[in-house]
């Protein structure tokens, strides 16, 4: 591999001379302690995992690559996703699109879950006109709910949605009421809300949602009749406001207040309209959306197959950044995977030709205001960037004044950081001097004061 490219507006540098097992990146996963796992197995546009790739899993930790070669993966081919257990930092699961689910503890493979030793199922060869002895356990993804139960999604299986409780019991959810077995070709990654509602995309039947409402299982879907541009949903992401962002092979939609999917029958997804430069148009119309990430400021990062990576404002109505191979270190405009690392603020972008990291300036919310930081500080002449304040909580009021108390900027946080363009309410850049930054939580119980020197 060629190492990891770290990009910020002023420099691009290779972080380590070692690298992933190969530059062909299929999916990136962020693990605890700023670690990364990268898969190289794959499926094609139609979720076909053949030819079955015998590739290992790349792992980046503490500045070095500590990769798991295929030889230790118990024969699991076409590994497409790695997911950490949020209640056990030393445990991850690797999803294989043919051989089941690998359990890895402290970097050692300890189990290969399949149809012989778990509640997972192989596809039905008779249903699919295959050799009766054919077995294929096609696990696209797993995700964990608030109780620590692990959910998984499997292709070409009637009861394709599985739940493994912390006690090791398996439960199966029948999807055939929405999706015939022979058309359950593939699914997106899973997203689980704070209320334990499960959302995922399907190749042929749109967005799928599952929840238990007052103890009753509810299975719902959205398709083109509900304003999706196509039934082929490739990526889903929940933001801080319980809005579900839906990426398809033909564009982007949003389901506001997503939990309504389970209680209302007349829902439709919303099209986002972008107005820039006097032009009005649909956001990402006809674009193949491959991956969506929500950063610590509730901004939306969207990867595409052919148009690079976009960063949109919280509401999706303005473009903050658009990275392409022409204006950034991206080696190609076909970007398969995004991963946001909340501690560092980095966004990782995985492509068929390599991995790029962008040093973003959105951080996850802090638990208190004890470590508020301001940078750059001081701000020197000719600096044209933003001032960043991070270490904040959500819904803090941030007020910036000059040394005698005249307010020049005020905002309310949506995540762990805010940015100021150094302009006052008049729109002009502020004068040289010391400025005070007052931060107060929305309940008024915590506060912090910082200073910044601005030199023009």
Q: Where would I find each of the regions flagged by the language model?
A:
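Glycine-centered coil/turn sites that cap beta-strands in beta-rich domains
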Residues: 367-399, 417-420
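Surface-exposed coil/turn segments at beta-strand junctions on protein surfaces, enriched
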Residues: 145, 193, 391-393, 413, ...
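Edge beta-strands of extracellular beta-sandwich domains
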Residues: 447-452
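Generic short beta-strand
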Residues: 141, 291, 309, 397-398, ...
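Short, glycine-anchored, charge-dense loop/turn motifs used at functional sites
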Residues: 397-408, 427, 435
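Short, surface-exposed loop/turn motifs with a glycine/proline- and acidic-biased composition
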Residues: 413-444
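Interdomain boundary/hinge segments at the C-termini of tandem beta-sandwich modules
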Residues: 454-456
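Carboxylate-rich, polar loop motifs that coordinate divalent cations or form catalytic acidic clusters
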Residues: 1-371, 407
């Amino acid at each position: 591999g060629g190492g990891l490219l770290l990009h910020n507006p002023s420099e691009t540098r290779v972080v380590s001379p070692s690298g992933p097992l190969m530059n062909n990146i299929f999916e990136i996963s962020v693990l605890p302690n700023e670690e990364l796992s990268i898969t190289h197995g794959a499926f094609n546009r139609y979720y076909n995992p053949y030819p079955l790739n015998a590739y290992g899993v790349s792992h980046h930790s503490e500045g070095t690559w500590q990769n798991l070669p295929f030889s230790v993966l118990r024969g699991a081919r076409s590994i497409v996703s790695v997911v950490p257990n949020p209640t056990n930092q030393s445990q991850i699961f690797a999803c294989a699109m043919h051989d089941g689910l690998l359990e890895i503890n402290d970097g050692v493979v300890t189990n290969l879950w399949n149809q012989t030793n778990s509640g997972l199922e192989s596809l039905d060869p008779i249903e699919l006109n295959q050799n009766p002895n054919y077995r294929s356990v096609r696990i696209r993804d797993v995700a964990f709910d608030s109780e620590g139960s692990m959910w998984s999604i499997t292709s070409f299986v009637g009861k394709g949605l599985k739940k493994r409780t912390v006690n090791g019991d398996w439960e199966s959810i029948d999807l055939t009421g929405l999706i015939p077995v022979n058309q359950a070709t593939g699914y997106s990654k899973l997203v689980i809300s704070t209320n334990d509602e499960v959302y995922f995309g399907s190749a042929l039947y749109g967005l799928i949602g599952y929840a238990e409402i007052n103890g009753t299982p509810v299975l719902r879907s959205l398709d083109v009749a509900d304003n999706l541009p196509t039934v082929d949903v490739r990526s889903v992401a929940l933001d801080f406001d319980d809005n579900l962002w839906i990426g398809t092979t033909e564009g982007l939609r949003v389901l506001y207040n997503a939990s309504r999917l389970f209680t209302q029958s007349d829902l439709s997804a919303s099209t986002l309209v972008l107005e820039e430069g006097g032009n009005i148009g649909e956001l990402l119309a006809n674009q193949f959306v491959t991956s969506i990430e929500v950063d610590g400021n509730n901004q939306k990062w969207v990867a595409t197959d052919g148009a690079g990576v976009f960063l949109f404002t919280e509401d999706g109505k303005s473009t903050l950044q658009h990275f392409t191979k022409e204006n950034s270190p991206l080696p190609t405009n076909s970007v398969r995977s995004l991963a946001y690392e909340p501690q560092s603020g980095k966004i990782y972008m995985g492509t068929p030709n390599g991995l790029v990291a962008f040093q973003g300036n959105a951080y996850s919310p802090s638990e208190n205001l004890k470590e508020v930081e301001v940078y750059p500080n001081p701000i020197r002449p000719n600096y044209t960037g933003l001032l960043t304040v991070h270490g904040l909580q959500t819904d803090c009021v941030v007020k910036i004044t000059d040394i005698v108390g005249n307010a020049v900027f005020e905002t309310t946080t949506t995540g762990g950081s805010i940015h100021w363009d150094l302009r006052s309410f008049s729109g002009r850049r502020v004068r040289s001097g010391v400025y005070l930054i007052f931060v107060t939580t929305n309940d008024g119980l915590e506060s912090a004061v910082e200073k910044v020197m601005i030199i023009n």
